């Protein structure tokens, strides 16, 4: 089921787009190759619920979603699916896993019923729907050719925060398995928001300052990916797989830390908050291995393992849990953090006591 009725003022449409958590976002990313006869949009969590709230113009916002990915003559359609996260919005709602499965089938059906070229856009939970549809279409021997369908995903947790747990981990609360997106023949553009906890997750979660910043990033980054300006998007990688599909990843860099955005919102002068950002940003960035300089061997989590980069840039396993093993993983992390903290405490004690000068590390921590 799809709908394509865009009504309401531009102000209303932008209001609706900016409030939903990735459900309806309008991005200014310009990608000529993404222009198509039809654009199918899979909204984010709860977009269907808000569709029934009076004066909340979700459907109207969809018109602004589509216009950045198509020419004036192209059409847009929003694919209907539960977009739920049980037990929200109600106890009768499907689980996230079931919601994603329904959305995947609906997107596949919509693609197969479309004529000409198609662009599938996934937003937040909808990006996981798009990933599933991509795999299903690719597996179908009668599926559309590579050149007829293209995918664009925003704030995709499957390509982001899901990498914290082992491949295939079943998450009961979501009723969903954390698996990497299937390699397909289709091209996909991946839009990542810096400090968005779903698409740009901190892989050193023991950094509490980073965690606090990421929590606020859910409100200030994840929900606002759709109002990015074209010049804000930086291409960070382009990879072509064995089937010929190319994945291009773009980063929407954050000018300000989400952690200090509330201060700006209540009227604290930007000059003062900018100073706070200068002090806090290195601390926040220390929670992301992607921010590491060459030769940095501090540990981080990848697919449920505590790993560190070697001098050659290759991942080296520090601690390996069992298949699920959350207790073993947490014990490994605690042991590693305790070791690092002990070294820091030892150096600090020596420096404060004045017995000797604190020595530099050997690069192993």
Region roles according to the model:
Residues 2-365:
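Composition-driven, intrinsically disordered low-complexity tracts enriched in small residues
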């Amino acid at each position: 089921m799809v709908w394509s009725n865009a009504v309401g003022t531009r102000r209303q449409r932008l209001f609706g787009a900016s409030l939903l958590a990735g459900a309806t976002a309008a991005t200014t990313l310009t990608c000529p190759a993404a222009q198509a006869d039809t654009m199918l949009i899979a909204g984010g969590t709860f977009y269907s619920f808000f569709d029934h709230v009076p004066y909340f113009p979700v459907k109207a916002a969809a018109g602004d979603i589509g216009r950045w990915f198509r020419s004036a003559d192209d059409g847009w359609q929003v694919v209907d699916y539960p977009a739920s996260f049980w037990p929200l919005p109600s106890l009768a709602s499907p689980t996230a896993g079931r919601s994603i499965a329904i959305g995947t089938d609906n997107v596949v059906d919509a693609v197969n019923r479309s004529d000409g070229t198609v662009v599938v856009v996934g937003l937040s939970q909808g990006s996981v729907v798009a990933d599933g549809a991509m795999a299903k279409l690719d597996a179908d021997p009668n599926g559309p050719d590579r050149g007829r369908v293209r995918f664009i995903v925003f704030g995709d947790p499957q390509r982001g925060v899901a990498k914290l747990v082992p491949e295939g981990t079943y998450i009961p609360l979501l009723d969903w398995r954390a698996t990497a997106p299937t390699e397909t023949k289709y091209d996909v553009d991946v839009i990542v928001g810096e400090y968005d906890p779903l698409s740009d997750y901190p892989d050193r979660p023991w950094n509490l300052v980073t965690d606090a910043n990421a929590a606020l990033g859910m409100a200030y980054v994840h929900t606002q990916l759709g109002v990015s300006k074209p010049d804000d998007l930086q291409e960070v990688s382009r990879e072509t797989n064995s089937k010929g599909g190319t994945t291009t990843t773009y980063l929407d860099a954050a000018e300000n830390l989400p952690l200090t955005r509330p201060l700006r919102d209540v009227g604290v002068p930007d000059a003062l908050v900018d100073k706070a950002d200068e002090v806090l940003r290195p601390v926040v960035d220390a929670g992301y291995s992607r921010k590491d300089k060459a030769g940095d061997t501090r540990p981080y989590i990848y697919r449920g393992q505590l790993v560190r980069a070697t001098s050659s840039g290759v991942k080296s396993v520090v601690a390996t849990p069992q298949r699920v093993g959350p207790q073993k993983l947490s014990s490994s992390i605690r042991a590693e953090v305790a070791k690092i903290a002990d070294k820091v405490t030892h150096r600090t004690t020596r420096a404060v006591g004045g017995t000797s000068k604190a020595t530099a590390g050997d690069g192993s921590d």
